[in-house]
């Protein structure tokens, strides 16, 4: 299969400015294509996983992936899909976040100097040096305010009578300039992004064609939700991060292990590298034994993100906990100051401290609802004092919230 054929087959396709022509060009030659990422956290999460898999697919077919870190545009904030202005972040935050994002991406794609090796650029490199009057003179006449006002990112905010600052309104101009700059300096001919970016992408393609007469394209992916309508990347416990310093490989495994039944075949197609033949076998397995299929899905996706050994460890830990009732030290672990446990800490405070509840009131509610266990024993008194007498032989205390969330406490 060609890049475009596999792109469509895997369910990544939503819209393209000229699919027939792009298909022809990518069959005949290798291109450079880019995807941009906000520089607002020290790791990407699974909400970006489809875009990452597309970068990987580009590289697989010999095309050059360009990753844009929005160091410049992050200072403004994209209004697309937002009800209010995003907080601006500092240069120091951007530098730290860029390092973490490259760590996330390096799990999936190869960076380097080769023809199909990925490169990562910060758009602050060219946006920070733009002179406002020069920009207006050279590019302002190519943008139609009438058209900009019809774009969903702007129109919806105005219809709801929500504040839209001139700062945010300029975001789409700068993103359009990114495409022009990458086309000129890196021979980039394709921008990819989520369907909410369609207006911005089309503006960039139009600007580039008008100024340089180059043939460029835009292509978008569908916005994904789970079968129940939840946004990809977030859970009640927080974001499903790709970097292990923010989320352990075991917890990453457990996210996929616990996904909704209706999602597993779709997720296998989107996020794994199973062949079409293997996907048919997987779909049959899901019809016969949904839990076995979930374990395979979780293993495959954890292996891709964290490596074979971590995926194997996560699988074994999950089996020990849920099928054999054992405690495994590969579980997420928090360390408490010895004095805290020696003096004793109430159950609700400990569950909050361990991250099994987002607030103390939620921890109380969890315990009252009979959803909390200490060392596999149900606790019903939220004020019960947990101290060193609860330490097991391996010097840990096992906390459980519901059937699927477990944490070890050490001192």
Swiss-Prot record:
PANTHER family, alphabetized: TYROSINE--TRNA LIGASE, MITOCHONDRIAL, TYROSYL-TRNA SYNTHETASE
GO BP: any one term: tyrosyl-tRNA aminoacylation
Binding site for L-tyrosine: 34, 171, 175
Main localization category: cytoplasm
HAMAP family referenced in this protein's UniProt entry, alphabetically: Tyr_tRNA_synth_type1
Keyword Nucleotide-binding: yes
Name of the protein described by the UniProt record: Tyrosine--tRNA ligase
């Amino acid at each position: 299969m060609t890049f475009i054929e596999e792109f469509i087959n895997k369910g990544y396709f939503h819209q393209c400015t000229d699919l027939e022509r792009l298909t022809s060009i990518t069959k005949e030659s290798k291109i450079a294509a880019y995807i941009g990422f906000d520089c607002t956290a020290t790791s990407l999460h699974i909400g970006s996983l489809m875009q990452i898999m597309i970068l990987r697919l580009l590289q697989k077919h010999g095309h050059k992936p360009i990753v844009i870190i929005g160091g410049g545009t992050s200072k403004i904030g994209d209004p697309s899909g937002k009800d209010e202005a995003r907080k601006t972040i500092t240069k120091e935050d951007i530098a730290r976040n860029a390092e973490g994002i490259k760590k996330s991406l390096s799990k999936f794609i190869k960076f380097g100097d080769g023809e199909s090796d990925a490169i990562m650029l910060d758009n602050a490199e060219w946006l920070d040096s733009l002179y406002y009057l020069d920009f207006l003179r050279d590019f302002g006449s190519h943008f139609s305010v009438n058209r900009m006002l019809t774009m969903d990112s702007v129109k919806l905010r105005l219809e709801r009578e929500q504040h839209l600052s001139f700062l945010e309104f300029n975001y789409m101009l700068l993103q359009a300039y990114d495409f022009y700059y990458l086309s000129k300096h890196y021979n980039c001919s394709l921008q990819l992004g989520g369907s909410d970016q369609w207006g911005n992408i089309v503006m960039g393609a139009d600007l580039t064609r008008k100024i340089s007469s180059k043939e460029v394209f835009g292509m978008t992916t569908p916005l994904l939700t789970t079968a129940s309508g939840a946004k990809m990347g977030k859970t009640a416990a927080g974001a499903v991060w790709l970097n292990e310093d923010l989320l352990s490989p075991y917890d990453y495994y457990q996210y996929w292990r616990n996904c909704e039944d209706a999602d597993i075949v779709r997720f296998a197609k989107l996020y794994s590298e199973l062949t079409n033949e293997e996907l048919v076998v997987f779909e049959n397995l899901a019809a016969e034994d949904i839990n076995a299929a979930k374990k395979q899905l979780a293993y495959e996706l954890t292996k891709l993100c964290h490596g074979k050994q971590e995926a194997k460890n996560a699988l074994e830990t999950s089996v020990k906990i849920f099928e054999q009732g054992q405690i495994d030290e590969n579980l997420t672990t928090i360390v408490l100051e010895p004095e805290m446990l020696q003096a004793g800490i109430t159950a609700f405070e400990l569950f909050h401290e361990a991250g099994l509840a987002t607030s103390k009131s939620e921890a109380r509610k969890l315990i009252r609802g009979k959803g909390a266990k200490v060392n596999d024993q149900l606790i019903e008194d939220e004020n019960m004092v947990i101290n060193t007498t609860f330490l097991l032989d391996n010097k840990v205390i096992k906390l459980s919230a519901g059937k699927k969330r477990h944490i070890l406490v050490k001192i």
